[in-house]
Amino acid sequence: MGLCKCPKRKVTNLFCFEHRVNVCEHCLVANHAKCIVQSYLQWLQDSDYNPNCRLCNIPLAARETTRLICYDLFHWACLNERAAQLPRNTAPAGYQCPSCSGPIFPPTNLAGPVASALREKLATVNWARAGLGLPLIDELVSPEPEPLNTSEFSDWSSFNASGSPEQEETASASAAPAFYSQVPRPPASPSRPEQHTVIHMGNPEPLTHASAPRKVYDTRDDERAPGLHRDCDDDKYRRRPALGWLAQLLRSRAGSRKRPLTLLQRAGLLLLLGLLGFLALLALMSRLGRAAADSDPNLDPLMNPHIRVGPS
């Protein structure tokens, strides 16, 4: 068990193997969506982990992922393809985790951020909607492209290359999606050419979807005061020496800044030092006086002639 370092400060037994911090389910969905997360006890037994998807052996950070209720992480495309290969009459219990053979569908009475995110993801495909008890959705079937008729282009001599630039731009604009921006036309003058429409042929959607670099949630702060205790995750589980607390105490005392004493504090300090010196002087004089009395022959009863000690 551990305490999550998010503002919720919840007690959890989940542990991120990559960042080596305790995480709750809210942080698991929001900040550790592509991290290997299991129980803290399992991390104590074996801290090694595989950052690749177990279905395609490709790093998890390269594609979109989904996390099951057993906290195993897979690529959503790999999991969807694997489940779509099963027969359509497969019972919900037949859809199992490829790693631990646990159920893919979360129970109806299970609530939490992980279960909610999994239900939202499963509701996008028909094989999972049937297991969740939801109505099926219409699958869009992409039409096959028709073969081009090359007979129409056999006579290339009929191709008219003397078309005007305005016609070429109009034809290209109608054939491909484009963003149009009309440039204001200045007043016509005989010395300046006529302004034309500028066509931006940029694609509104990016061609490649590159995953953003993963954030490293490091709880260490390098700008702390030298006297404060550093709760470093790397040194959290290292064996500490027996007298480490004494060295840390001396280091914190030596690194603290010295503030000037006020007049009242100085007077109190002098009074305390004087009292301690007076008590030390009394103890010293008492010890010396007792030693002198023990060695004084006048105080020895056996040396007194008026005292006779004999057999009784």
Curated annotation (Swiss-Prot):
Recorded protein name is Zinc finger protein-like 1
What membrane topology is annotated for this entry? Answer: Single-pass membrane protein
Q: Which GO terms describe its biological process?
A: vesicle-mediated transport
Domains: entry comment: The B box-type and RING-type zinc fingers although degenerate play a central role in function of the protein.
What's noted about post-translational modification? Phosphorylated.
User: What function is annotated for this protein?
Assistant: Required for cis-Golgi integrity and efficient ER to Golgi transport. Involved in the maintenance of the integrity of the cis-Golgi, possibly via its interaction with GOLGA2/GM130.
| Protein family per UniProt | Belongs to the ZFPL1 family.
- Listed PANTHER family: ZINC FINGER PROTEIN-LIKE 1
Query: Which residues belong to zinc fingers classed as B box-type?
Result: 1-43
What organism is the protein native to? Bos taurus
Q: Which residues lie on this side of the membrane: Cytoplasmic?
A: 1-268
Q: Which UniProt keywords apply?
A: ER-Golgi transport, Golgi apparatus, Membrane, Metal-binding, Phosphoprotein, Transmembrane, Transmembrane helix, Transport, Zinc, Zinc-finger
Transmembrane residues, as ranges?
Answer: 269-289
Which InterPro entries does the entry mention? ZFPL1 (IPR039043)
Composition bias, Basic and acidic residues:
215-233
Which Gene Ontology CC terms are recorded? Golgi apparatus; membrane
Under CDD domains, the record lists: mRING-H2-C3DHC3_ZFPL1 (cd16487)
Which intervals lie on the Lumenal side per UniProt?
290-312
Q: Which GO terms describe its molecular function?
A: zinc ion binding
